[in-house]
Amino acid sequence: MSRTRRTALALGTAAAAALSVASVTAPATAAPSPLAGSTTVTPAGHAFQATLSGKATLKAGSVTVTCTVSVSTGTVPAAPGNQNAAGPVSSPISPPTYSSCTSSVWGVTPTVTTSGSWSVSMQNGSPITATMTVPTGGLVVHTTGLATCTVTAAPSAPASVGGSWANGAPPSLTFTNASVPVTVTGGFGCPTSATSSAFNAVYKVTDTTDPAQQITVGP
């Protein structure tokens, strides 16, 4: 092989190696995320109550817990906290209460307890999205009877439960097959392999400061 050819080959190999190293070490440039739109929740500073319409279900594995009574309360942030030029507006809410609950497993009675700091945030859009934050260990289902089980939601960290909001008279907050991380402990009949549950519920929201007004989410 001629000296000129060997030199060209060596230069080509070095260039290829340099390109290979560059492709490995050069940082990837991510596409910019779209900015969230503006959100305003009104009336500012008004208290509200969310009341379950129909039934709420929490399904873990083959077991479904159904409750027909659930209530939570909260307050729209006072101005200017009820507005966000580029993102959601968040409101603290009381831990939702759940009662009149039944299990899909015969002979098993569930009890639902909630605790901690809960919140709900609204992001204007089409549709309007709602995110309920469950604090760590903030919802626990305990069953007695033929199967003694404990289901703990958000077992290791706060969990974001996605839903939607619809303005109206009254407005509604809906969760459809929303995924919630869980751990399940117990013996025979308990779905101990389940790591997530599906939550379904529709809440009607009323303005308790002035019942003639409606809680509204807009731009």
Mark where each language-model region is.
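Intrinsically disordered, low-complexity, charge-dense segments enriched in Lys/Arg
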Residues: 168-181, 185-186
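N-terminal segment immediately downstream of the Sec signal-peptide cleavage site
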Residues: 28-90, 181-219
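Elongated scaffolding segments in large macromolecular assemblies
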Residues: 146, 150-174, 195-203, 208-217
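Predominantly extracellular/secreted and cell-surface proteins with exposed
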Residues: 69-169
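Secretory targeting and sorting signals
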Residues: 1-30
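Generic detector of low-complexity/intrinsically disordered segments
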Residues: 11-13, 21, 37, 54, ...
